[in-house]
Amino acid sequence: MRVREIQRNYQNWWRWGMMLLGMLMTCSIAEDLWVTVYYGVPVWKEATTTLFCASDAKSYETEVHNIWATHACVPTDPNPQEIELENVTEGFNMWKNNMVEQMHEDIISLWDQSLKPCVKLTPLCVTLNCTNVNGTAVNGTNAGSNRTNAELKMEIGEVKNCSFNITPVGSDKRQEYATFYNLDLVQIDDSDNSSYRLINCNTSVITQACPKVTFDPIPIHYCAPAGFAILKCNDKKFNGTEICKNVSTVQCTHGIKPVVSTQLLLNGSLAEEEIMIRSENLTDNTKNIIVQLNETVTINCTRPGNNTRRGIHFGPGQALYTTGIVGDIRRAYCTINETEWDKTLQQVAVKLGSLLNKTKIIFNSSSGGDPEITTHSFNCRGEFFYCNTSKLFNSTWQNNGARLSNSTESTGSITLPCRIKQIINMWQKTGKAMYAPPIAGVINCLSNITGLILTRDGGNSSDNSDNETLRPGGGDMRDNWISELYKYKVVRIEPLGVAPTKAKRRVVEREKRAIGLGAMFLGFLGAAGSTMGAASLTLTVQARQLLSGIVQQQNNLLRAIEAQQHLLQLTVWGIKQLQARVLAVERYLQDQRLLGMWGCSGKHICTTFVPWNSSWSNRSLDDIWNNMTWMQWEKEISNYTGIIYNLIEESQIQQEKNEKELLELDKWASLWNWFSISKWLWYIRIFIIVVGGLIGLRIIFAVLSLVNRVRQGYSPLSLQTLLPTPRGPPDRPEGIEEEGGEQGRGRSIRLVNGFSALIWDDLRNLCLFSYHRLRDLLLIATRIVELLGRRGWEALKYLWNLLQYWGQELKNSAISLLNTTAIAVAECTDRVIEIGQRFGRAILHIPRRIRQGFERALL
């Protein structure tokens, strides 16, 4: 019974099995994946490129930064854009940032360019006979109650009045005198206190800064060329070397003032929350520590006095400008609010104590070195100040913020005595020096301290000592630029991406489509944090923004280059602008060349014939397109992109070969082309030519026949009559008696053929011939189609019967197999049951056997 039940349900199983097999086949076919090219994907890679600058310089101002920026920079964007990249993390390293090196080279170029047209002071490298200029102090009322006379009084020997001999071109030798600061002089003979020379005469070429040029820096923006972008980290507690979770993209940095200073960072950017401590390696005492403050500390610097400026001419267009002292000589100084400074040092000490794991932080003055390092050196309105900061860095703090050192009575402000140098060692390179001409009148500049540069005394932070001594440092201007560029990095945009899809390229006729120009460039990376599926929907917009950004930046660069052309001053920055322009065009053309080689010109999504290899990535489509960003996907397949590109190129070459062979057989590509109106017009023309040819031949032969008959005496114009000719023998009657003598159907013959009659006969015979042949051809075609249809139907019926037969055989085989299996299972089950029964009976009979054994034993 069970076998019969299985046989009855077999048909349902058979149907469900066939459906399952079909579904499996469909799924196996649907899993075929193909490489698809996407243009405009938000992907970038770290890169090094030539940056250009933008500024709002005014060319009519003589400030050196204005002149340099006017020649070198493009105007700033009046509406800068910053695009937040959601769900994007990026690694930054402020200590390995090529932007810092570029800015360092640019500031060197700024100073070199500002000194090129100025006077070289080589004629002054002579022996100077100098005497001290005695100065008197002013009273405390005029100087201010917070500063003592001793603090403002110029030390004896600080300023010297020197005389020397010069011989101008075309004139006799004459003696001149000039006033120099003691820091700018070197004593020649120790035994003679009056013989001096300028400090850099034996090592450097001294160039006097142009008298109408100042050194007040203006903000300069660094911008990336088209095809590149600048990533900005917006994490408020970013230490410079970690993974940033709040990333945005900008085309230019914020305005950076290239302030050249040591120990104290002036007029920079502030930390948004707490004070930030940054160092390449805090445990290495050779690495500087950069402190970014969260609040500014005002520093007010002044050079008092009624100094004047006088010129000493020693050649055509050459003059040395020296100081003319009028009245009292007073020392330059800077003042800082003591409360603000103590609060700043307290916060720095607490932060350093937690980072260095020290309980006591000691701030001490510089340990020695060049004046540029041992003092706070900076430029104030054209004069170079060297201020003693020992009063600033002279305290001890616990890591909880308590001050341990005995502070003197607070006067409200800290006064830093400053010295002024006119011969400056160029910080950027050796062998060069600059003479800063004196500035007349009182000089005052108000600046904001936004950071510190500190050095740690020798020893490792792992020492058992709980004390840590920190001193002011500096000298490497790269640290100044790092303090502003720490949150930026330059990346190269890679708009080409490949990913697997189910779409395969179809060979169809394509129309060329031009890619239009969009708006701005920065929106290109706006979809970087989106999944690949979401980002692929904006490829057109991103590709347009890429090209639009290139065009826009090229226009800006061209305007800057044109400005340099009419000034006839194509500087190093002008060359960089040309490089940026060429680089942007090359990047775009390179991408378009690859798209053209792959047969994807004018497309943002381009399918290919290349099957996706699971060894490249075995992720599922849903996982790729719904869970991954383009950046994550690019990192995963970065090792295989070269292989994929080669396969796409080879596939395109093979496709072009196939298309060429197909075009050679284009006329046979479709039977429907035979029935186009142009083809039928061609057929009609051929038919007319054939018919006309036949008629022409017939006419020629008729004329020849007529000529032949005329020669034989035949007249073609005589009237002839047509007589009926009998169809049978002449003795046969024309009718039949039973039929009432009805005449049979006969045909007439033409006794004499005329010219018109011959033409008519030929046309009639030709039409009849064509009709008969076409009718026969149609009948033959009908018979062939009928025969093929019948044979085809018979073949289909035969195949159907064969399929039914084999299906029935398979069905019978399956039923037989199931029957055999059921019988075998039943027999096996019976055997098992029987064995179990026997085993059970044996167990049940054990007591009986024991009893029988006892009975036999008793007998």
From Swiss-Prot:
Q: Where is this region: V2?
A: 162-201
**Gene Ontology molecular function: any one:** structural molecule activity
Species of origin reads Human immunodeficiency virus type 1 group M subtype A (isolate MAL)
Protein name according to UniProt:
Envelope glycoprotein gp160
Q: Where is the lipid attached (S-palmitoyl cysteine)?
A: 767
Question: Does the entry annotate any disulfide bonds, and if so which pairs?
Answer: 53-73, 118-210, 125-201, 130-162, 223-252, 233-244, 301-334, 380-445, 387-418, 600-606
Q: How is it modified after translation?
A: Highly glycosylated by host. The high number of glycan on the protein is reffered to as 'glycan shield' because it contributes to hide protein sequence from adaptive immune system. Palmitoylation of the transmembrane protein and of Env polyprotein (prior to its proteolytic cleavage) is essential for their association with host cell membrane lipid rafts. Palmitoylation is therefore required for envelope trafficking to classical lipid rafts, but not for viral replication.
Q: Present the record's domain note.
A: Some of the most genetically diverse regions of the viral genome are present in Env. They are called variable regions 1 through 5 (V1 through V5). Coreceptor usage of gp120 is determined mainly by the primary structure of the third variable region (V3) in the outer domain of gp120. The sequence of V3 determines which coreceptor, CCR5 and/or CXCR4 (corresponding to R5/macrophage, X4/T cell and R5X4/T cell and macrophage tropism), is used to trigger the fusion potential of the Env complex, and hence which cells the virus can infect. Binding to CCR5 involves a region adjacent in addition to V3.
Signal peptide residues on this chain, from the entry's feature table: 1-31
Region (Disordered) residue spans: 721-744
Motif YXXL motif: which ranges? Answer: 714-717
What the entry lists under HAMAP family is as follows:
HIV_ENV
Instruction: Give residue ranges on the Cytoplasmic side.
Output: 708-859
Keyword field: AIDS, Apoptosis, Clathrin-mediated endocytosis of virus by host, Cleavage on pair of basic residues, Coiled coil, Disulfide bond, Fusion of virus membrane with host endosomal membrane, Fusion of virus membrane with host membrane, Glycoprotein, Host cell membrane, Host endosome, Host membrane, Host-virus interaction, Lipoprotein, Membrane, Palmitate, Signal, Transmembrane, Transmembrane helix, Viral attachment to host cell, Viral envelope protein, Viral immunoevasion, Viral penetration into host cytoplasm, Virion, Virus endocytosis by host, Virus entry into host cell
What else does UniProt say about it? Answer: Inhibitors targeting HIV-1 viral envelope proteins are used as antiretroviral drugs. Attachment of virions to the cell surface via non-specific interactions and CD4 binding can be blocked by inhibitors that include cyanovirin-N, cyclotriazadisulfonamide analogs, PRO 2000, TNX 355 and PRO 542. In addition, BMS 806 can block CD4-induced conformational changes. Env interactions with the coreceptor molecules can be targeted by CCR5 antagonists including SCH-D, maraviroc (UK 427857) and aplaviroc (GW 873140), and the CXCR4 antagonist AMD 070. HIV-1 lineages are divided in three main groups, M (for Major), O (for Outlier), and N (for New, or Non-M, Non-O). The vast majority of strains found worldwide belong to the group M. Group O seems to be endemic to and largely confined to Cameroon and neighboring countries in West Central Africa, where these viruses represent a small minority of HIV-1 strains. The group N is represented by a limited number of isolates from Cameroonian persons. The group M is further subdivided in 9 clades or subtypes (A to D, F to H, J and K).
Q: Which residues form a coiled coil?
A: 635-669
GO cellular component terms, semicolon-separated: host cell endosome membrane; host cell plasma membrane; membrane; viral envelope; virion membrane
Region (V1) residue ranges read 130-161
Di-leucine internalization motif: where is this motif? 858-859
> What is the primary gene name for this protein?
env
Where exactly is the site Cleavage? 513-514
Pfam families according to UniProt: GP120, GP41
